[in-house]
Regions:
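Non-catalytic structural scaffold of enzyme domains
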Residues: 1-122
């Protein structure tokens, strides 16, 4: 029996499902957990302090409950506002969406890329 990695994909809503789809394409062998924090949606309306106070302990509960090998923060706002505190608080590796924008631009055939973001992101 092989040990399948667990990848947790986190977003403030359902927009991260497109990120989940691409991660599944890249790692079809993994076990996936998708978490949408719709109770605090939309993240772009909250201060960085409020997001950190919400997301960091919530992530601790998710790590304890699911034991992921990798966490993908599929929310641009959460990536920009909470990624550094999450990495400082937990040993589990985190991947954000914002760093992925540069390679996406480089791979664009048309060299036109749209980025949707909240005031807290852009």
């Amino acid at each position: 029996m092989t040990n399948r990695p667990t990848i947790l994909v986190f977003d403030s809503g359902l927009g991260g499902l497109s990120v989940l789809r691409e991660v599944v394409r890249a790692r079809p062998d993994a076990h996936y957990v998708y978490v949408a924090d719709d109770a605090f949606f939309p993240y772009g309306h909250h201060s960085q302090e409020a997001l950190i106070a919400r997301v960091v302990p919530l992530m601790g509960e998710l790590i304890a409950g699911h034991r992921p090998d990798l966490i993908v923060i599929a929310c641009n706002t959460a990536s920009v506002q909470t990624l550094a505190p999450l990495r400082a608080a937990y040993a589990t590796p985190f991947v954000g969406t914002v760093p992925a924008i540069k390679p996406a631009c480089a791979q664009s055939r048309t060299k036109r890329v749209s980025v949707l973001g909240t005031k807290a992101t852009v």
